Structure formats: C-alpha cells, structure tokens
Amino acid sequence: MRYTKSEEAMKVAETLMPGGVNSPVRAFKSVDTPAIFMDHGKGSKIYDIDGNEYIDYVLSWGPLILGHRDPQVISHLHEAIDKGTSFGASTLLENKLAQLVIDRVPSIEKVRMVSSGTEATLDTLRLARGYTGRNKIVKFEGCYHGHSDSLLIKAGSGVATLGLPDSPGVPEGIAKNTITVPYNDLDALKIAFEKFGDDIAGVIVEPVAGNMGVVPPIEGFLQGLRDITTEYGALLIFDEVMTGFRVGYHCAQGHFGVTPDLTCLGKVIGGGLPVGAFGGKKEIMDHIAPLGNIYQAGTLSGNPLAMTSGYETLSQLTPETYEYFNMLGDILEDGLKRVFAKHNVPITVNRAGSMIGYFLNEGPVTNFEQANKSDLKLFAEMYREMAKEGVFLPPSQFEGTFLSTAHTKEDIEKTIQAFDTALSRIVK
C-alpha cells in the first residue's frame, strides 16, 4: 500500500498541531509507522486519502457500533441539521435519549448529558466527593478515565499508595487524593480502605478494562467492589465510557449483574458524535445544580445533533445484536488461536461482548503488569503487516479492537487469513 498523500498531509499537520495530531495515538508512534489520514467510511470499511481500503476494527475508538455511515443515523442527522445545530436551550431530543438510557442502564435513575467521556468522569468524581463529603478516590492501575488531573495518576511502589502524577502539569496536591491499586486485586483494595476508608469518596473502575488492552474482571471482583464500598459508605462508580452498550444490552453492569451507585457513559451513546453522560441514583443526582449545590454545566451539553446520533444508534441495538457479536467474536477468537498456534507464536485472547484484545504472550492477562509482558516489538510488526493486508487495527497494544453490526463473517474470515499471511512474513 502507498501512503504518499498521508505522509504529505502529516508534514503539513506537524507545522500546525503538536505532533501533527489532536490525540496522541493518531500519530502511530508505538507501531513505528506513518500516520494514516482517513477520507471516508462505509459499513465495516474505512478508506484513507491514498485510496486504500481497510476492514475497520478501530471504529473511531469504539463509538461506531453500527459501523460507518449507518443509514438511519445519517438520515436523522440530516433532518436535525436542517433545524439548527445548537440552541442553548433544551430540546425534546434530550428527553428521548435520557429516557432510553434510564430504561437500559440498571443503575441510572437520572442522567446528565455532557460532551465527552472525560467530562463525564470528571463531573462524576466531583459529585461523589460533594455527596459524601470525602476527598479521596480509588482507581485501578491500567484503567484510563480520561485526562482530568486527578485521574492521570500511576501507582507507587506499595500495594495501596497515594498517587504520583502521570503527566507533568498535574500538581502533587491533586495526585495525593487519588489512590491506585492493581486491577482485579480485592486484597489490595481492602488494604486501601483499611488505611484511608473514612476519607474515600468512591471507587472508580472500568468494569472491563479497555485501556490496557481488553482485560475482563475475574470472577467475584466486581461484586467484591460492591461489597467493600457499601461496607465503608463509599460510592461505587462504573466508568462505562467504553463498555456501555458494547458489553451487553444493559451495559457491563447488566451483563455482570453488579449495580454501581454512579455510571459514566460515552462513545456508543453518541454514535460517533461528541457525547458523554453520567447518572445514578436519584438521591445522588439531585445534588447537582440547579437542584443541588454541586456545580456542572456545558455549552454544548445535550446538543441536538449529538442527541439525535445517540438515540438513533441506541434504538437499533437489541438483545439479538449481542448474540451476533458473540457469534462473530467466537469465530475471530478461534481463528486467532488457530493461526498463531500454526506459527508457534504465543497469544492470549481476551473478550467481552464486542470488545476483543490480544496479547502476544502466554497469559493469562488479568492486570496491567501482565499486559505489559506482551511482545510490543512483535505487535508493531504485526500491525504494519496487517495494514498491508487491508485490516485497520488499533496502533497500540493497550487499546482494544471493536466489532460492529456492519461486520460480516466474510470480514472475520478475511481478517483471520490476513493474520496468517502476516505471520508467514514475520516468522521465518
């Protein structure tokens, strides 16, 4: 494949934007390949400005659960645009999407719309602190909750240490109110609560970690979180920005049967437009302005285009949708294991609904430490060879791949064959 136009576009972009991009992963640095500039998408396919076609497993990092340019979404967006893009006042579309979310998500009795997943998690933590009157938040190593200061934290050397900033510009004073413990480790969480329990406002977790690859919870982990937070009077917060409506019809919380106090949503809820949301029990949500004194606002929150895209996306998802994802996922997982075994290359495949992650190690992978043992050099080689075969994968070991309703068995079989061909070139 040729990337002449993409390379030329990147040279210009680098003079205009830091690193030439508006989000770091788009620079493709971790796979040591030129950034690709996309032109358009349709169904399960995406096309770059050089005219190359790919089967797309990135799907805009998860939102496009119906694939690209879904006819129903696009048609209703045209109708919404004809009425205006934003009004600075409420519309009936907000009611429609809010009601649908409340009907589908077990923990949500009231919901507040925002414009991004980062906003959703940031506002949720403010609400948790304001509601409980406590300061500290517990997060898990390897879980990403957006780029707000208090969540850009890495673990120290201890089991349950106060956080250190993971980025310059994050004051240590903010970091000290974030406690980081290993994912899937209830013993570490218990130690954190024994030390700081009286000042822990809440525990925030991706019910399926999606930013260290795809790492599902081990049996009993989520219920353990529910039990411990209840015991100490802290709030359990599910960050379902990625898992929401991907893992199941009732999100991850419905799939696993564990109900948090607060839930953050994003990605799929916007169907490809900028949307986030957070919600939970009425008694907690009513503390937000204008009913309560915990402030939150947004100029474009609940804008009609985003509400339209979100509603028309979610309204097409049914329980049968997730049966289809499971069928495609079974085929892909079995094919990956078969092909990698054929070439004597170790692989660990983790799945949750339409989220799939593969690690180039023996496994298991249940936490960030184990995820980091994946062969990153081989992953980069694999990425480059798969792109040559017309398969667009996330250019990072620590991002998951996604399925859409537009993907077909033929797409999956072509992808498995592409892995076989790629490995034939890599493994001599």
Swiss-Prot record:
- Keywords carried by this UniProt record: Cytoplasm, Isomerase, Porphyrin biosynthesis, Pyridoxal phosphate
| PROSITE patterns associated with the record | AA_TRANSFER_CLASS_3 (PS00600)
Kindly list the places in or outside the cell where this protein is found, as annotated in its UniProt entry: Cytoplasm
Q: One GO CC term of this entry?
A: cytoplasm
Uppermost EC category: isomerase
Reaction catalysed by this enzyme: (S)-4-amino-5-oxopentanoate = 5-aminolevulinate
Q: In which pathway does it act?
A: Porphyrin-containing compound metabolism; protoporphyrin-IX biosynthesis; 5-aminolevulinate from L-glutamyl-tRNA(Glu): step 2/2
Which protein are we looking at? Glutamate-1-semialdehyde 2,1-aminomutase 1
| Gene responsible for this protein | hemL1
